Amino acid sequence: GEYEALPEKMTKEGAQPDFGARPFDEGVARTGATAVGARDFLVAVNYNLNTTSTRRANAIAFDVREKGRPKREGNPITGKIVKDENGKTVMIPGTLKGCKAIGWFIDEYGIAQVSMNITDINTTPLHVAFDEVCRAAQARGLRVTGTEIVGLVPKRTLIEAGRYFLEKQQRSTGISEEEIMKIAVKSMGLDDLKPFNPKEKVVEFLIEDEKDVAARERLVRMTCKGFAYETASESPAPGGGSISAYMGALGAALGTMVANLSSHKAGWDARWKEFSDWADNGQAVMNKLLALVDEDTAAFDKIMAAIGMPKGSEEEKAARAAALEAATLYATEVPLKTMKTAMEVFPVVRAMASEGNPNSVSD
């Protein structure tokens, strides 16, 4: 039951309200209860097929969806459906856990699709589902020509897919997230029917405030020339801390470059994963140091803001002193973090100097 069963449900062990626990009284009888549920992210995706046959698309959907297809006697298509002792249809499970799918024809595109909801992206990531649908289609003489994401996806869905397809190619994964997502888009044909813009389809990009991001990345978004001119100007920031972080980031970038070159060097195919892992490490350190470029200047700005606080009354003096102390402490912690992070560059560049492509040792 729904509302009618509320008095009984409220007293059951483990079913009591998480908030607003109270007996079923006149007030609750009037207002009822609000149930709020949460689930993991659902990815809705359509796979484009080189056919107009809904029946063929359905066959592929039944092959892969977790529920599968009904078991039949004799002919697997026209035979009598098998029932169990309770009269329920016996199902032959599909190959993908946490997936629901059906085949249909789309008038707008003039093709058939396998339409899928991936309800558990931890068990069945998008790229795994894509490869399996491709396999099932090929087994039936068909081909997946592209993929259409319906709605939004978390960024990790595209990152995981891009890394997966790079590894299948035995190519380094130590590249920028933008490049990794581009590989995912091309590998799964996400732009087959219409342009695919991650800025419009990835959850994280849509919920972030671009103004906040721009303010947080003011320095690293500058050109090399602009950053140099800003440093040379009368403004006290950016100063040594930001420049040190940027120098460290460039050092990490060079080590990463050599790792990527080594990973794809002719004759070194057996070592691609070794260098890909080093490139991954270098890319991670570089990104941390790039973030510290702006964080160091932000820390200095906090000191300047504290210095500018009013100091007319004793209360204002106390507040100003406390703010200045906190800002000064933060302004010492950031350079320390920069030094510790910069130290993480050395294992990468040391390995590349001794093991990497000898043509790049000067880098």
Task: Describe every region a protein language model picked out.
Residues 1, 64, 133, 254, ...:
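Hydrophobic alpha-helical packing residues
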Residues 220, 224, 228, 232-243, ...:
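Disorder-to-helix initiation segments
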Residues 41-43, 296-363:
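Amphipathic alpha-helical interface segments
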